């Protein structure tokens, strides 16, 4: 059975690692992005993402902007 993919987006490496480690222990496949722009790149490269865990305050593009952009294409839970 394929593991569900979760995209974790946070500009703080420690937070991404903490969330990633927890999710991997629960047998999820974790994709990471360090800012909003990178999050969109990862999202559009992997259309089978089951969930996005998204920080709101990030450089380049904040979480609200990312959420609006993704919502125009998908109803993936954020």
Residue spans of the language-model regions?
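The short loop immediately C-terminal to the conserved phospho-acceptor aspartate in CheY-like receiver
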Residues: 56-57
């Amino acid at each position: 059975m394929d593991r569900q993919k979760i995209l974790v987006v946070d500009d703080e490496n420690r937070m991404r690692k903490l969330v990633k480690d927890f999710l991997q222990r629960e047998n999820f496949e974790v994709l990471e992005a360090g800012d909003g722009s990178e999050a969109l790149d990862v999202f559009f490269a992997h259309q089978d993402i089951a969930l996005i865990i998204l920080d709101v305050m990030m450089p380049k593009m904040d979480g609200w902007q990312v959420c609006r952009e993704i919502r125009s294409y998908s109803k993936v839970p954020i």
